[in-house]
């Protein structure tokens, strides 16, 4: 057992460096091509001329598509999904290393060019890839799946600064169980990855800075639970829209470069209305949490960002939809909170409270992982006082969503690429 914990520590270190490598590559490309050193794609888009804001996501999608198509022709095989660690856990625990690296590079291109897709998917993939490479050299074959799981959890912990949520992501979403024998090394890897990532970044700050001064009372629990019901209804709708957009892009029968370029062009067009559609939504989430906008502003940005996410994911842009889902949930919660705030004197606090609730519950509704979703929001924001209410709301959202839409976002993604 102790040798497993030692290996888990090594896996956590490797995962932290894999995530840091991808993050620094992003910053380098943003500096080279967008003249942006802030780390925020929204800031980069704001400072670009309209024609560059329009064309940059399309050119990034075109470059990524050419890379994927070139690799497909070179290897004479159909590309796999970018989330290969899920396939590896469901099969024999082996990776196609070269294909995974190519997809990570393609993800780097679309992410840094502004597509509304998550960068964390590629980070987690690289972390799992590093863990797999180490495991195949130093561990027996029957343990390979365990170390891939540890790498994925560690990558998630380093990307989101949420080690417990990263561990439970593996337990709830990938393993479908919470066996202690498997969970121990996973938690060790996740915690080590977070600590090493903090050392690399010279910071142990929370992912999101939130100033929530409300003390949760009976009324607030009722509002939180009602938000869970709303998210439980919105989750299946979001999954249905994503599936419909994917089918729509496929029906066009475009070559991969042109399909990804079309998705990027749609993002570019939407960015002419608001630069907030660029990127995975992290900086927009932070700005909303710092100062919740008015109802109509939230609604406008929400609609544009939703269309951008659907265009990016539907076109097949390699990357994750985890962080974009957090923004969509935040916007839904804040829209609900702003509407209710008209009837309460503390409308600002209600808006912020229900925004955080929306993040957790929509994540639970799309992943069907309520415990992970609850812990993730608490770890990212430090608002652990919300834990009891969020847990109830996330369970409700997950149950409603699972009733209306059997597949989670991950199973749907795997089915689309199978």
Curated annotation (Swiss-Prot):
UniProt topology in membrane: Multi-pass membrane protein
Using the UniProt record, give the first listed, main subcellular location: membrane
Report the transmembrane regions from the record. Answer: 2-22, 54-74, 146-166, 178-200, 222-242, 258-278, 291-311, 316-336, 352-372, 380-400
Q: Which GO terms describe its molecular function?
A: voltage-gated chloride channel activity
The answer on whether this UniProt entry bears the keyword Transmembrane helix reads yes
Q: Which CDD domains match?
A: Voltage_gated_ClC
Per UniProt, which keywords does this protein have? Cell inner membrane, Cell membrane, Chloride, Chloride channel, Ion channel, Ion transport, Membrane, Transmembrane, Transmembrane helix, Transport, Voltage-gated channel
Gene Ontology CC annotation, any one? plasma membrane
List the GO biological process terms: cellular response to acidic pH
For whether the record's keyword set contains Protein biosynthesis, the answer is no
Localisation per UniProt entry: Cell inner membrane
Pfam families (UniProt xref): Voltage_CLC (PF00654)
Question: InterPro entries, per this entry?
Answer: Cl-channel_core, Cl-channel_volt-gated_ClcB, ClC, ClC-type_chloride_channel
The family annotation for this protein states: Belongs to the chloride channel (TC 2.A.49) family. ClcB subfamily.
Please name the HAMAP family in this protein's record: CLC_ClcB (MF_01203)
Q: What is this protein called?
A: Voltage-gated ClC-type chloride channel ClcB
Taxonomic path: Bacteria, Pseudomonadati, Pseudomonadota, Gammaproteobacteria, Enterobacterales
